Amino acid sequence: MSERNQRKVYQGRVVSDKMDKTITVVVETYKKHSLYGKRVKYSKKFKAHDENNQAKIGDIVKIMETRPLSATKRFRLVEVVEEAVII
């Protein structure tokens, strides 16, 4: 297996695009509670590199793990899966 295929890929929603070439993506996951068995939702925010500033707030995007690009950026934008509907 090649090294690129072992990188983590997440799908999440853009919650901030105010920074230049950087977006904040919230990724929601569900885990089962060990004792009670109920599904519990967890969310985590990641900063991702957006070279062309193409992602906007509310978009569903796919991000991939990469080398550290700054103090907090460890992901890069792969694609915009679904664009947000602006009303």
From Swiss-Prot:
- Record note on quaternary structure: Part of the 30S ribosomal subunit.
Question: What does the UniProt function comment say about this protein?
Answer: One of the primary rRNA binding proteins, it binds specifically to the 5'-end of 16S ribosomal RNA.
Q: Which family does it belong to?
A: Belongs to the universal ribosomal protein uS17 family.
Which keywords belong to this entry?
Ribonucleoprotein, Ribosomal protein, RNA-binding, rRNA-binding
Could you say which residues form the signal peptide?
none
BP terms from Gene Ontology: translation
Q: Which GO terms describe its molecular function?
A: rRNA binding; structural constituent of ribosome
Give the domain of life.
Answer: Bacteria
Q: Which InterPro entries match?
A: NA-bd_OB-fold, Ribosomal_uS17, Ribosomal_uS17_bact/chlr, Ribosomal_uS17_CS
Gene behind the chain: rpsQ
The name this protein carries in UniProt is Small ribosomal subunit protein uS17
Its cellular-component GO annotations read: cytosolic small ribosomal subunit
One matching Pfam family is: Ribosomal_S17
